[in-house]
């Protein structure tokens, strides 16, 4: 099941597809709706420095020492809400210039960024 979410991320407006991890015959779980609510309320802009740091640590040779425009390297395209009962988990999925095959996931729990990783971690 999916829906659209209009969101401003790092001072740029996006219309993102929200994907809920559901079985074909299943409705979206209350825990997934709660996770989306926390994600919408999260201060995603606060993650910018962490994302820049991640990019520099992973690909500093290609980037240099600073990042002026994060969108040269990272572009959000979707929000994924897994089937978890205990944590309110949401992943902001992003295209990543240096790993176009796998992309990048910013994992939020209860509205807080907890991990930046390969999307396989959450999918």
What role is predicted for each listed range?
Residues 1-66:
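Long, contiguous N-terminal structural blocks used for assembly/anchoring
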């Amino acid at each position: 099941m999916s829906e659209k979410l209009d969101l401003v991320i790092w001072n740029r407006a996006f219309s993102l597809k929200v994907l809920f991890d559901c079985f074909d015959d299943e409705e979206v779980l209350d825990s997934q709706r709660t996770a989306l609510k926390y994600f919408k309320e999260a201060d995603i802009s606060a993650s910018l420095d962490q994302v820049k740091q991640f990019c520099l640590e992973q690909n500093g040779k290609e980037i240099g020492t600073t990042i002026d425009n994060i969108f040269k390297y990272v572009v959000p395209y979707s929000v994924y809400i897994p089937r978890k009962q205990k944590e309110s988990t949401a992943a902001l999925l992003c295209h990543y210039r240096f790993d176009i095959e796998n992309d990048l996931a910013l994992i939020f729990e209860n509205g807080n960024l907890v991990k930046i990783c390969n999307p396989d971690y959450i999918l």
